[in-house]
């Protein structure tokens, strides 16, 4: 390496440093370098070469190699300043010890497959037994070659040499700036009354009165009132805002409310600085964006715990110069004591937070507890300070730190001074709370110094410490206290007011903490042993992290329909499998990104609340099973027999199963099914199938480990320490079990003997999820092995080991190998570079113009969701495109500003399957639009500007990016009414869509609507009745017939059925309770009061007041029972019940407003009484269509195809009459359908002599558009007139729409006849089998079917 390369490179400084090590070269090189660099390029090139030759010959320098330069550079970078991070106060970056220079690669010998070229014709070059393919050889051979393997990049700087600024440090700075930001005092225009009351004389009188009254009002003397300008600004806030309120300081709970009248509370506002500041805070929270108010807590630092500390302690307390005995100084301490009680409600949490603060200092302290487990004495050394605290007191943190002088510390550090006599009053009298405040304030000072010299390792250590200490996400202290309190409310004892005996459940029986579960090596155990928590130095591979997850809350277990056997003792049912929820995907992903690799389910606390009467002889055998094994003995992790006649029960079970987080994230669906609750019931018969039996709440204790080296070995038979607090007489929870801790609450009844049973494993047939992408499915298990349980006597001893068998069958091995997901790990997008304000959830948006004048039915906008997603190309859209489908529901937000006086309503329709005809462009009739269940935005109601698009509910599937498929998802924006108050100009508003909820399962909805249609399906209808208007000054009654299944017909002749009509058309009538919503859409200038009743006859005004009714002024959600002479109402015609809407007060409006009061009724659903729901007689068999010959006078050969989709048929060869029935309506009003049916054909021959009858019919089954794939064929002559064919409606992917063109891969039946004129008529009927499914919600038909050349299915009834 010559001087030319040396000085021209970027490492010139390091090269000079290396050369300066040679004696006498330093000054000469510097002078020469300056001289040569001042010359031109040619001279510099020659000078470098000449200088190097001269120096090499005279000085005999050793040539500077790359290795020598790398070693010197690393030595310079590994200095003490760099290690201590004090080389520079800048917080942007720091150097890495690798110097940015990659390590040298390594040469390795590898076997490489080298092809052997074929020998030319007539020649043979093959030798040594290796032949080419031409001479019948392999044509290739293995040769050993040397390959250079590059060294891995530095994990700290990725080869750049500079460690970037840490994200925790950036977060700390942003939080510090946010907390130190100040806001100006509100300066609202002052009312003349405020100015009058704020005059100097009036304000002086007010301050004088407040000085004498403050003792009785706030329990202390207020010697420092605010000035007049401050009081007037606060009083103006009360004057302007009727919903404002401010409480007096102290514990009297008095408050002042807002109002603008002369006798309202604004004139009673005292000149108190604290009350004025509270009003200013309230005003800023309402009007100032990003306003931040520090939370009230003792020792809370915003994540991570750094920043300003806010202690709600009395600020003006006189510290007594002598030690006092149990008395608290004067002043209001309720707020401080509330916070202290919140932390010390459990002594463990209080000491935990206390030690965390104390861990920042060297020393040791010892806390003594009294008989009530409260701190009574603290002795020790902390931060070089002697500590002796004997009495708790209240201190002023604002004055605490400045009042500590150096002399105080000098006295404390003197070992010769007696602790009891010479301790300064400041440290002796403040008690535990004073020590706590001192530590917190001192820690805040230390952290501010730390910000000037950031240490990456120290910041990461603190974050890791907080994560491991809290056992989950980093939360603030108030949030952590709130979580603990809510947790105790769930598991602690509470009074059962509605129980049969009103008894109390023992709190000790229902409380389980981490210390009870994680015995040895746990983090909290280390805290106790060390006394003071020390900051973790790096991530120890032996370190474990424990989490407590509320996996299932209020999960309902229903009584199964399958009964295995019965005897004189009772009935033994089949198994009911309930998947226990696991931590959410986002939480699991955060743990994996933080470095945790494995998760072990250690303990499962299963709490059971019985829904059967007390002392009912019903037992349940609950087993926690592993969902990834076909052998019942291997899958059965733990189980217990529970008596359900005692209302409350709980089981502590030990699954002890570990999973790898990487595979869990790749195949998250399989991870969610890893723990399954299997329940077998035994008891007296008489329970109905589907009846709620008991509910469960499962609390899972999980241990996370960074490597396989970490973790604690938990044994199922070594849990005596856990049982110490849960054992005793009458504390057993269950009757018998295996691999469980012990009995914790035994019933008072004697258990009966349960019969022998066979326990089956978790079924491997998961819910079928079909997609339109043709992806392969996982292999399903063909065989499983059950476990025979002969008696519960063997389980009486609790921890009874169960024998395990290894399932080595080929089917099981193939299944376990097939469990691995075929999907690759998707690359993660950078969360910090886009969508910061929306949290990364913004999907797309559309700008819509609202004209100044509109008519009802005006189409404001129509746009395709797919087009908008691809045009916007946000981070969410990129993720969907990578996954191949829309994986979350959408939340739509309309930014049309609220206006209570305009009196207009906007309808938003999600047409998922393109049912709205193409000829609808600028106007859409409201009678047709309301059949789509639109979302109504009322400008006078702010809450209606947001709604959710549920793809599984409305579409029946997730939207796929690989193609449009059957979905044509469009959003229609329609004006539903006119402006009741004239607008000055048109306006534009934004309609935005954000992602919402958990990740959807790819493919079809998991629980679609299926046959047979029952009364329980009527609970979710969402049926909108026609909007009505009552003219101003009109006192009348309007009737809405409850004929909910009738078709809708518009003035233009269009007909439509809603999804609710499709369900209700399966019933002649319904009875029960109707849940509905009444919304007022008129202007706020138009006011009225309505009374709504549901009755069978027209009621009188006095009768209306006595019967069940609902009074409506603006908006109301209500429920009314169907009242009629028949106890139910007809779904067709006007002979049933009706909504009677009567005006209690006729609509009123100002003189210039002449429009009436507009409102609409939306029926949410019907809580039907099954005994009052009369079903149609032909509920399983429906007439489809009738085929007739066009001309009987001549021969008419025909070929008519029946498609595999239900819809209106049309043809140019025959006359087609389509029938209307419940099945046709339901197919037309849903998105897709799929299932097995039987198609029945019946025909009628023209009357003729048998010998002259020449009629023939042929029924051909096939697949595809062309007649290439032919199935069964049946021919009939004049002696037959019926034919039945089992048939499956659907597409190659499963479900299919009710209209559209036939696919290339689709089943069909073709009717062929050489002369159809011999047939008078041919009827086609459909017999629906159980399990026929319907996906999505829509409306139809909205158009009249057009005549085409061939028979085709047209969407309709």
Swiss-Prot record:
Q: Which domain of life is it from?
A: Viruses
Q: What is its main location?
A: host cell
Listed GO CC annotations: host cell cytoplasm; host cell nucleus; host cell plasmodesma; viral capsid
- Tell me the Gene Ontology biological-process terms attached to this UniProt entry: transport of virus in host, cell to cell
The residues the entry assigns to the signal sequence are none
One of the entry's Gene Ontology molecular-function terms is: structural molecule activity
Record keywords: Capsid protein, Host cell junction, Host cytoplasm, Host nucleus, Transport, Viral movement protein, Virion
PTM annotation: Specific enzymatic cleavages in vivo by the P1 encoded 3C-like protease yield mature proteins.
Q: Where in the cell is it found?
A: Host cell junction, Host plasmodesma
| Similarity-based family | Belongs to the nepoviruses RNA2 polyprotein family.
Any remaining note in the record?
Virions are comprised of 60 copies of the coat protein.
The protein's name is: RNA2 polyprotein
């Amino acid at each position: 390496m010559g001087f030319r390369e040396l000085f021209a490179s970027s490492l010139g400084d390091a090269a000079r440093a290396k050369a300066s090590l040679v004696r006498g070269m330093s000054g000469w090189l510097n002078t020469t370098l300056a001289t040569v660099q001042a010359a031109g390029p040619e001279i510099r090139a020659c000078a470098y070469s000449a200088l190097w030759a001269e120096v090499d010959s005279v000085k005999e320098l050793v040539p500077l190699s790359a290795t020598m330069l790398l070693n010197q550079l690393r030595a310079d970078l590994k200095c003490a300043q760099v290690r201590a991070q004090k080389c520079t106060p800048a917080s942007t970056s720091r150097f890495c010890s690798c110097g940015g220079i990659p390590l040298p690669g390594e040469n390795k010998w590898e076997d490489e497959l080298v092809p052997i070229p074929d020998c030319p014709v007539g020649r043979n070059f093959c030798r040594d037994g290796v032949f080419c393919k031409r001479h019948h050889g392999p044509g290739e051979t293995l040769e050993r070659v040397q390959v250079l393997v590059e060294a891995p990049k530095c994990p700290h700087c990725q080869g750049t040499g500079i460690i970037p600024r840490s994200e925790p440090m950036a977060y700390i700075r942003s939080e510090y700036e946010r907390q130190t930001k100040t806001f100006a005092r509100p300066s609202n225009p002052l009312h003349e009354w405020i100015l009058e009351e704020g005059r100097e004389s009036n304000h002086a009188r007010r301050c004088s009165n407040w000085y004498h009254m403050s003792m009785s009002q706030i329990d202390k003397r207020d010697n420092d009132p605010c000035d007049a300008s401050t009081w007037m600004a606060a009083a103006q806030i009360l004057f302007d805002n009727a919903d404002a309120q401010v409480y007096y300081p102290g514990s009297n709970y008095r408050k002042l409310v807002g109002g603008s009248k002369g006798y309202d509370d604004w004139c009673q506002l005292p000149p108190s600085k604290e009350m004025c500041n509270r009003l200013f805070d309230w005003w800023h929270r309402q009007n100032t964006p990003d306003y931040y108010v520090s939370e009230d807590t003792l020792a809370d630092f915003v994540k991570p715990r750094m920043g300003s500390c806010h202690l709600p302690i009395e600020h003006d307390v006189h510290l007594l110069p002598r030690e006092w005995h149990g008395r608290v100084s004067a002043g209001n301490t309720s707020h401080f004591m509330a916070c202290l009680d919140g932390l010390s409600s459990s002594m463990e949490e209080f000491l935990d937070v206390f030690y965390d603060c104390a861990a920042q200092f060297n020393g040791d302290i010892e806390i003594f507890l009294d008989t009530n487990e409260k701190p009574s004495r603290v002795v020790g050394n902390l931060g070089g300070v002697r500590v002796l605290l004997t009495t708790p007191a209240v201190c002023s943190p604002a004055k605490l730190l400045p009042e500590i002088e150096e002399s105080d510390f000098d006295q404390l550090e003197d070992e010769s001074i007696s602790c009891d006599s010479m301790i300064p009053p400041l440290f002796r009298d403040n008690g535990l709370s004073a020590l706590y405040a001192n530590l917190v304030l001192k820690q805040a000072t230390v952290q501010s110094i730390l910000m000037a010299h950031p240490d990456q390792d120290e910041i990461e250590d603190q974050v890791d410490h907080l994560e491991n200490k809290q056992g989950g996400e980093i939360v603030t202290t108030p949030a952590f206290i709130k979580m603990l309190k809510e947790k105790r409310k769930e598991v602690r004892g509470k009074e059962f007011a509605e129980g049969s005996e009103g008894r109390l459940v023992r709190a000790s029986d229902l409380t389980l903490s981490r210390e009870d579960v994680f015995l040895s090596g746990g983090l909290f155990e280390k805290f106790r042993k060390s006394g003071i928590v020390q900051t973790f130095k790096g991530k120890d591979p032996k370190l474990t992290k424990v989490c407590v997850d509320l996996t299932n809350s209020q999960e309902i277990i229903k009584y199964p329909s399958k009964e295995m056997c019965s005897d004189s003792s009772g009935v033994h049912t089949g198994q009911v499998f309930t998947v226990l929820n696991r931590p959410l995907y986002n939480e699991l992903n955060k743990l994996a990104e933080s470095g945790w690799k494995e998760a072990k389910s250690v303990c499962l606390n299963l709490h059971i609340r019985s829904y059967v009467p007390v002392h009912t002889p019903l037992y349940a055998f609950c087993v926690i099973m592993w969902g990834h094994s076909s052998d019942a003995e291997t899958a059965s992790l733990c189980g217990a027999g529970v008596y359900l006649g005692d209302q409350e029960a709980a089981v502590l079970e030990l699954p002890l199963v570990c999973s790898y987080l990487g595979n869990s994230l790749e195949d998250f669906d399989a991870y969610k099914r890893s723990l399954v609750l299997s329940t077998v019931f035994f008891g007296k018969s008489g329970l109905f199938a589907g009846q709620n039996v008991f509910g469960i709440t499962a609390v899972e204790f999980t241990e996370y480990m960074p490597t396989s080296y970490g973790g604690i070995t938990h044994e199922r038979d070594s849990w005596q320490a856990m049982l110490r607090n849960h054992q005793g007489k009458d504390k057993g929870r269950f009757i018998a079990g295996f691999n469980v801790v012990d009995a914790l609450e035994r019933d008072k009844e004697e258990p009966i003997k349960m019969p022998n049973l066979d326990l089956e494993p978790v079924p491997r047939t998961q819910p079928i999820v079909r997609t339109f992408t043709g992806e392969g499915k996982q292999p399903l298990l063909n065989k499983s092995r059950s476990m025979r349980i002969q008696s519960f006597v063997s389980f009486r001893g609790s921890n009874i080991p169960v024998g395990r068998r290894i399932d080595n069958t080929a089917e099981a091995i193939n299944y376990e190998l097939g469990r691995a997901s075929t999907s690759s790990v998707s690359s993660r997008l950078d969360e910090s570079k886009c969508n910061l304000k929306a949290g990364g959830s913004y999907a797309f948006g559309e700008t819509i113009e609202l004209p100044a004048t509109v008519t009802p039915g005006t189409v404001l906008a129509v746009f395709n969701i797919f087009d908008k997603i691809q045009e916007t190309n946000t981070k969410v859209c990129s993720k969907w495109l990578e996954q191949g489908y829309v994986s979350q529901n959408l939340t739509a937000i309309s930014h049309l500003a609220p206006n209570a006086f305009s009196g207009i309503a906007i309808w938003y329709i999600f047409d998922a399957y393109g049912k709205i005809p193409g000829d609808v462009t600028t106007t859409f009739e409201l009678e047709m639009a309301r059949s789509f269940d639109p979302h109504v935005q009322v400008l006078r109601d702010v809450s209606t500007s947001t709604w959710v698009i549920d793809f599984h509910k409305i579409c029946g599937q997730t939207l796929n990016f690989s193609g449009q498929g059957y979905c044509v998802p469009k959003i229609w924006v329609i004006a539903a009414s006119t402006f009741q108050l004239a607008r000055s100009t048109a306006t534009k508003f934004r309609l935005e869509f954000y992602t919402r909820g958990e990740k959807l399962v790819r493919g079809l909805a998991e629980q679609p609507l299926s046959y047979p249609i029952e009364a329980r399906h009527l609970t979710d209808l969402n049926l909108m009745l026609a909007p009505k208007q009552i003219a101003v000054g009109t006192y009348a009654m309007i009737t809405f017939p409850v004929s909910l299944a009738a078709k809708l017909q518009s003035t233009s002749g269009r007909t439509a059925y809603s999804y609710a009509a499709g369900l209700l058309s399966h019933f002649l009538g319904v009875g029960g309770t109707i849940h509905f919503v009444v919304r007022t859409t008129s202007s706020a200038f138009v006011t009225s009061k309505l009374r709504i009743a549901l009755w069978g006859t027209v009621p009188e005004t006095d009768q209306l007041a006595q019967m069940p009714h609902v009074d409506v002024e603006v908006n109301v959600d209500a429920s009314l029972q169907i009242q009629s002479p028949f106890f139910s109402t007809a779904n067709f015609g006007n002979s049933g019940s009706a909504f009677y809407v009567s005006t209690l007060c006729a609509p009123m409006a100002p003189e210039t407003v002449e429009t009436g009061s507009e409102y609409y009724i939306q029926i949410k659903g019907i809580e039907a009484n099954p005994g009052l729901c009369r079903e149609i007689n032909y509920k399983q068999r429906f007439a489809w269509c009738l085929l007739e010959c066009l001309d009987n006078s001549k021969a008419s050969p025909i070929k008519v195809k029946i498609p595999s989709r239900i819809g209106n048929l049309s043809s140019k060869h025959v006359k087609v009459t389509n029938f209307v029935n419940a099945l046709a309506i339901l197919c037309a009003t849903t998105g897709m359908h799929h299932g097995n049916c039987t198609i029945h054909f019946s025909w009628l021959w023209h009357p003729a002599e048998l010998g002259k009858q020449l009629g023939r019919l042929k029924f051909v089954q096939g697949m595809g558009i062309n007649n290439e794939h032919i199935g069964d064929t049946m021919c009939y002559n004049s002696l037959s007139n019926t034919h039945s064919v089992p048939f499956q409606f659907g597409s190659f992917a499963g479900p299919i729409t009710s209209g559209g063109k036939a696919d290339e891969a689709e089943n069909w039946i073709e009717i062929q006849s050489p002369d159809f004129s011999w047939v008078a008529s041919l009827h086609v009927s459909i017999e629906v089998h159980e399990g026929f499914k319907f996906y999505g919600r829509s409306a139809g038909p909205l158009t009249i079917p057009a005549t085409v050349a061939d028979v085709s299915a047209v969407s309709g009834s």
